[in-house]
């Protein structure tokens, strides 16, 4: 059904490095109930130690940072994760505005004449991932809003059908 292929680019390794730089390893290891050196080793691509899925889940939950999961998904050519537990149908405008903000950041980086440094590359990737998350949450919030108002859902379905019959969609 799906044809996942592992990327030749070290997305997961880069995500591990970024995660390690972003967080205090001693405090995080204590909160996770891990030895700090074990945590450092598992975040170091040069070491043979690897995270187990429950460890990835725990670190993502403790830090509210999806960098490791996004790196894992990018390694198999998948889009970043979308935390649907943050979904609130009344935040549709907020999701759209944040998505557009991230798109603006990406556009700014794309038209810049500055050299593409590693830091700029990571910032652009983070903007893309955040934008995808916000657009996905926008779509889910819109869907939830339409499901709670059947009349609105019927109007949208009718207009979509009329538009499709005239070749507008």
From Swiss-Prot:
InterPro entries per the UniProt record, alphabetical: Phage_186_CII-like
An example molecular function term from Gene Ontology annotations: DNA binding
Keywords: Activator, DNA-binding, Early protein, Transcription, Transcription regulation
Pfam family, one: Phage_CP76
Domain of life (superkingdom): Viruses
Function recorded in the entry: Involved in the establishment of lysogeny.
Protein name in UniProt: Regulatory protein CII
UniProt organism field: Escherichia phage 186 (Bacteriophage 186)
Gene: CII
